[in-house]
Amino acid sequence: MVRSNDQRPERSAKPRSGSGAPADPQCRLPAEAWDGVCCGACPDHDWWDDDEVAASPPFCFGTSRALDPAHLARTYALGYKGGIKGNEERAWASRCVFAMVYDHPVAALEIIRMAIAYSETDWQVTLIGCGELESLLGRHDRKIIGAVEQMARESPKFRECLANVWRHGMPDDVWDRVLAASGRKPTA
């Protein structure tokens, strides 16, 4: 499903064909690559009534003592499962990934790749593409385009997600590579 003129697609939350739970994607980055990546943008813990929750680690840690990429990617994908409004309980994950886009582009791309694999609906794939993936490419175009092209070759689902990316200020050469990797016709 490709976004068209920013109109909501007809099948907003249709389960993807070949259903069943998505396979658990393996994180490709070593554990040390996640050191210092936590954005600290979790909702303030002090609004919780429960003192134990208020003192808990950031949400992206899950049940571990460090950022858990699988937990973050799964929560990020599930945040878009409810359609255009998403899921408020999981909105923190989208904010976390968006913060990563600016300071940790390689980590952000890995979370996006994993979230696409966890996605269960066309709508989730669309929102990830026209959201954080588009922002990431717009900000770090030449730094990550090679990895993006590789992921598009490896995964039809990632390629479909990439088809939802708009130009967002990318230079001509990078934009042509995005178009080609997503199966669209380059401009030249």
Predicted feature locations:
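Polar low-complexity intrinsically disordered regions enriched in Ser/Thr and small residues
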Residues: 13, 21-23, 39, 43, ...
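A generic structural signal for solvent-exposed, polar alpha-helical segments
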Residues: 40, 53-54, 82, 172, ...
